[in-house]
Amino acid sequence: MAEDKKPLSRSEREAKIKDKAGWVITVIAALLAVNTYISNGNSSKVLNNTIKANDTWAFYQAKSIKQTLAEQSLDDAIARKDTAKAEKMKAKIERYESDPATGEGKKELMAKARALEAERDQVRKSGPWMTFSGMAYQLGIVLLSAAILAVSMPLFWGSIAVSAVGALLMSQGIWLWLPI
């Protein structure tokens, strides 16, 4: 004769959920911590690259002003037929335009500033994904806490599903595998 399974009491169900939830909440919290760490690093990189790019553009503008002044001096030297000064100014103007030896010509500065901006823009793309991921992890933790209090397996599985979405969003934030 088959024994009828008695339904679990509330305290037995609560113990069962607490056993599972303890491990799950630890994993979700660890993922949330990693997500926050990466997000903060990305925020710092965006800020640093913005500052560096702005500094480089300011240096570029200073070189442009100096080049304009050198061009005016060149015109004056040509008008006064001072060939020595004219040659000196031509060399200076060429160095302001491009100076590969020091990397401080306008051409090199523009390339450096654009590279910094491109890196900043690439890192900035991950920001929303990491934010949404963090929100999903937090919601997963809240649902898991509610599952423990309500002794509800559907809430438990719902928290796992929401956290899985958080992991998917975090992977998009890290690798940008979807071209959105």
Regions flagged by a language model, labelled:
Residues 32-55:
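Transmembrane signal-anchor/signal-peptide helices with a preference for the extracytoplasmic
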Residues 7, 13-16, 20, 138-180:
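Juxtamembrane interface at the cytosolic side of transmembrane helices
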Residues 111-134, 143-148:
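Short, aromatic-rich amphipathic segments at membrane interfaces
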Residues 52-118:
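Long, solvent-exposed extracytoplasmic domains/loops
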Residues 58, 128, 162-163:
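Polytopic alpha-helical membrane proteins, predominantly small-molecule transporters/carriers
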Residues 16, 29, 34, 83, ...:
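Terminal, low-complexity, charged helical segments
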Residues 10-21, 122-130:
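Short, Lys/Arg-rich cytosolic juxtamembrane segment immediately N-terminal
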Residues 1-7:
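N-terminal acidic, proline/glycine-rich, low-complexity intrinsically disordered segments
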